[in-house]
Amino acid sequence: MEIKIRRRRGQIAETTVKKEVEEEEQPLSPAARLFHAPEFNCYIISVVGLKNKIEPDMIIEGIKQTLMRHPRFSSKLVNNCNNNRQEQKWVRTNVVVEDHVIIPKIQTQHIENANADVFLESYVSDLTTIPLDTSKPLWEVHLLDLKTSDAENVAVLRIHHSLGDGMSMMSLVLACTRKTSNPNELPSLPYQNRPSSGSSSLKTSSRCYSRFFWLVMVLWSAALLVLNTVCDALEFIATALFLKDTETPIKGDFKLSKGKRMCMVHRTVSLDDIKLIKNAMKMTVNDVVLGVSQAGLSQYLKRRYGEQEESKRNSSNIPKGIRLRAALLVNLRPTTGIQDLADMMTKGSKCRWGNWIGYIIFPFSIALCDDPLKHLRRAKSTIDRKKNSLEAVLTFVVGKILLNTLGVQRAANVLNRALSNTTMSFSNLVGPVEEISFYGHTVTYIAPSVYGHPHALTMHFQSYMNKLTISLTVDPTVISDPHKLCDDWEESLRSIKVVVQERTSTQ
């Protein structure tokens, strides 16, 4: 009897040890392995402006109480060779938070605000050339005692993309913040109504039409969805094989080398102006952002082509039939998950973490329009057509299939070729609607972006309170004047707003 009990206890102990080992070691997901391939060694970087002076001890203690509870932030990357096959795992380790918090010594007494902005841009750009140390978890926080034109001090968060996508990271960072009006409350995001093509439209149709016509409409909608998805799939395949964008002044010839220096700048505009246009044109914020971006890119290219052909300065300068497409990132999660991530760090609960993003190949219509509202209408028409497709889901699924069948290196080559044949990346994230604090430090703006992928231009938009921050990550050898692109974006927004106000007042 004793022998049986001992054996059973031994089995229980062995099972417990196995379970602990499994919890201590986690294999990298296929997407995480992809982000460690040389062609896709991507990093997420976020510049956070703070309203008050940084107190490093408060931030370090806050990180210990929050981020350290998340397994990805307390695990390091380990490469093992098993039967001549390389295996990558996340292995839990003891983290010394102070080693991840970097406080550079800056001689600020002779730096004015304008020069401080240049210093910050140079500092962040230099970070893009320095890889993270793989002997410890792949994240770091830089605390800069630097007063800029729009912040008292600045924090810079740098995280390897294999830890999760932009939505994961943004939600996680927001889960570490609190409302300034109520320090015990998590920030809230604006409600996003995502009506499915099913429920509400089907109910309305069933009231208005007979069942026969209702069935015809359902079949027609399904047929359009399938047709659009097939067309988008064929375009993606063609792009991966041979279909290239026009060689414009903003398209890099990207054989992205390791440690390539990227330049990062940002500009903040009023979100109220975006909403004014949105309400007048009966669009979404994303529609307006896409339309203004299309107008801004057209203005910027007009100048660049004019510089190349000074003799034609009085003409439109822009060649006809430009193919300029963006890889538009789409979050595939049903919810943003701030509460789930906060629970994860306090209770150990699980939520959908990792890289859950798909791509849409979005064609910008580059042209000069007498009526700036044409850019809005064209952008809305294009994105509405893309919404009636499963392209984002398809690219996510195909990416996983390629990784599982071809392996990381070959899949990286295919995806790298597809992205290299487009011109730029584009993403838009929704932020908190009220003022928040980051470990006791009031936040003035959030400017996230990503680098390491084969694009000379990445445009990222982040809303916060009543502001919208535009972050540009550019290859300075291709786009040497990113601030002028920001100027063109801002001027396009202003001109569209003026036209909208004039037409609204005359109605």
Swiss-Prot record:
The keyword Phosphoprotein does not apply. Its main location: membrane. Pathway: Glycerolipid metabolism; triacylglycerol biosynthesis; Lipid metabolism. Residues 233-507 are lumenal. It holds the Pfam family WS_DGAT_cat. GO terms for cellular component: endoplasmic reticulum membrane; plasma membrane. The active site is at H161. InterPro entries: CAT-like_dom_sf (IPR023213), O-acyltransferase_WSD1-like (IPR045034), O-acyltransferase_WSD1_C (IPR009721), O-acyltransferase_WSD1_N (IPR004255). Mostly expressed in flowers and siliques. In the N-terminal section; belongs to the long-chain O-acyltransferase family. This is Wax ester synthase/diacylglycerol acyltransferase 5. It comes from Arabidopsis thaliana.
